[in-house]
């Protein structure tokens, strides 16, 4: 049976689970071009079809790779949460903070920069990392 305490580890594991789910979305569900992608490029799908014929096939493969990386980040985050973070191994806080910033943190910031439709969802996905780090510092 997995213990819920310390809460910081459980919340971090939840953040890792969200990344697993996001990875699965990118691998199996996310279309190559979203409506927001076309808006950002100031294109419509019919306008872009002839210009970007092979782009969609290429993007599908790009998103497989990105999805696998996101999934792996989530998997490693869950492992870290239930091992080093839970036992407060030296350096665990810094690694988790840096990992959060360089993964979901940067993804969220960039999505705000481009005005993504998913920016608020990504911000919510960032909260478990922030809460886990705060609770870790508070020894909770």
Residue ranges, per PLM feature:
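Hydrophobic, membrane-inserted alpha-helices
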Residues: 76-80, 100-110
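Membrane-helix boundary connector in multi-pass membrane proteins
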Residues: 104-123
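Juxtamembrane helix-break-helix junctions at the cytosolic face
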Residues: 74-93
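Membrane-interface helix-boundary signature
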Residues: 1-11, 52-62, 89-93, 114-118
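Membrane-water interface at the C-terminal end of transmembrane alpha helices
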Residues: 128-140
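Helix-loop junctions at the membrane-solvent interface of multi-pass transporters
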Residues: 28-29, 112-113, 138-139
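Hydrophobic alpha-helical transmembrane segments of polytopic
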Residues: 8-18, 66, 73, 92-103, ...
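Hydrophobic transmembrane helix segments
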Residues: 17-63, 67-69
